[in-house]
Amino acid sequence: TMWNVAVERQIQVKGPDAEKFVDYVITRDATKISPMRARYVILCNAYGGVLNDPILLRISKDEFWFSLSDSDIGMYLQGVNADGKFNCTIEEIDACPVQIQGPKSKALMKDLCGDQVDFDNMPFYGLAEVKIAGRSCVISQSGFSGEAGYEIYLRNATLYAEDMWNAVLEAGKKHKLMVIAPAHHRRIQAGILSWGQDMDMQHNPYQCNLGYQVSLSGKGEWNKKADYVGKAALE
């Protein structure tokens, strides 16, 4: 299935202090996220309330995208850096995604992208830069279904959305691709939360099964020593 999730907004954080800034606003350790990898993250307010739970894409050493469908996180992030303490830009960019989900998603993506990406060895939450119908896209192995799947983020989406859309439809013909709206019953079955429906800023991570996102005494990305918004309330 192809899901039209163009409602998801991409907030770009870019510049020399991008990593430092992102690490300050999320609960897990951003310094341990490699370029061309993504992660599911949460942002909390000073009281520990969950402000949003976006997918964070690390496009390069100094560039991150917060991919979110609800709330005004873009304005929040700009407010956090209103004093210019962090040397980075924060803006919503013209990049919109569609999701290819289901057991045939890998086969479809191979037909769509050819040898641009080694899909057999692409890790979960791995990213890749590709051209689709000659247009620049970022692909992530992720989705909202709990099944195998991918997200295609089209750059300059207001100009080239139709080109990418038609290319996916053409590649999907032999796979019997169906275009649907986001299937919430699938994400509910998979235990995937939706901010604004399952939790909001009135809930802390421990109240909605997201306590693992808080760095306490864990390892790796959970062994975070740096300060972050909400740390005093959560730890």
What are these model-predicted stretches?
Residues Y47-G48, G134:
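Detector for glycine-centered tight turns/loop "hinges" at secondary-structure junctions
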Residues L51-P54:
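Short beta-strand and beta-hairpin "edge-sheet" elements
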Residues L57-E235:
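Conserved, structured C-terminal
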Residues T1-L43, G49:
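Acidic, proline/glycine-enriched N-terminal capping motif
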